[in-house]
């Protein structure tokens, strides 16, 4: 986490709505820090069980995606040549943080997409954790280079990955994409569903605590026709 930022700053505060606290998660995670959006614009996140807004997020723009994509491209130059041992160390720290905050992640998914807490814990959060555990297991013995006949097959990281994930398995779909990307030396720009973005933002805190180099993982919230389209079209995203 860069100097001058804190988890409280990153996650905003809380406001009162109908006698209930509304979480404010108004920052994006870009280049290793929680940052303000280029242009202020907010969206209420609805708890489907109560049909009430329980959180506010910022909606990003093309400018936010551009900032994240350029950060990811800069980071790719060095992250793509890190050793397997280095990447395993970061993955293990993410796994440890994931395990420690599993109840928080499950609770957040219950709030944002309505899964009962047992299902959110056993089938949502735990399965998401499995993707990171499996990525680390495979990476430990994966042959990135091997001889085939008279030639050598070398597997290299593809570049900057633009990831757009849905609401119904919000953390599982994030993990199933982010884990192999980080394991293989790719960098990431993630847009979680604006309908259920809070578990992904909590996951970003775990990534931050793991100490990944700035720009390796970036998160920008927003709608499909704006942030999603910008990710799909950005020249720095492979």
Task: Please name every model-derived segment.
Residues 2-56, 89, 93, 143-164:
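Terminal low-complexity tails and localization/encapsulation signals of metabolic enzymes
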Residues 93-97, 101-104, 202, 206-212:
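Generic non-transmembrane alpha-helical segments
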Residues 51, 87, 109, 132, ...:
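Residue-level signal for inorganic ion chemistry
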Residues 70, 92-103, 115-141:
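Long amphipathic alpha-helix in the N-terminal Rossmann-like dinucleotide-binding domain
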Residues 143-238:
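Rossmann-like NAD(P) dinucleotide-binding subdomain of oxidoreductase/dehydrogenase enzymes
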Residues 108-116, 145-150:
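Short linear capping/connector segments at secondary-structure termini
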Residues 54-60, 75-81, 128, 163:
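Short, well-ordered beta-strand elements within core beta-sheets of diverse protein domains
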Residues 65-81, 104-112, 138-139:
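Glycine-rich phosphate-binding segment of PLP-dependent enzymes
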């Amino acid at each position: 986490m860069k100097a001058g930022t804190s988890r409280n700053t990153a996650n905003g505060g809380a406001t009162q709505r109908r006698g209930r606290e509304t979480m404010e998660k108004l920052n994006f995670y870009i280049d290793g820090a929680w940052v303000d959006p280029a242009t202020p614009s907010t969206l209420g996140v609805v708890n489907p069980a109560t049909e009430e807004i329980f959180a506010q997020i910022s909606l990003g723009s093309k400018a936010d995606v551009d900032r994240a994509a350029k950060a990811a491209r800069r980071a790719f130059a060095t992250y793509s040549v890190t050793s397997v041992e280095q990447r395993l160390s970061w993955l293990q720290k993410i796994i440890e943080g994931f395990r420690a905050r599993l109840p928080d992640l499950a609770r957040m998914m219950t709030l944002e997409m309505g899964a009962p807490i047992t299902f959110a814990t056993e089938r949502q959060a735990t399965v998401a954790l499995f993707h990171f555990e499996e990525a680390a297991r495979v990476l430990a013995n994966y042959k990135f280079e091997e001889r085939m006949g008279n030639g050598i097959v070398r597997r290299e990281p593809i570049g900057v990955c633009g990831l757009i994930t849905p609401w119904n398995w919000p953390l599982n779909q994030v993990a199933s994409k982010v884990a192999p990307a980080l394991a293989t030396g790719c960098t990431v720009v993630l847009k979680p569903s604006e309908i259920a973005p809070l578990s992904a933002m909590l996951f970003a805190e775990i990534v931050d605590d793991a100490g990944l180099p700035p720009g390796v993982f970036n998160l920008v919230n927003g709608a499909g026709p704006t942030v999603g389209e910008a990710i799909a079209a950005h020249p720095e995203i492979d």
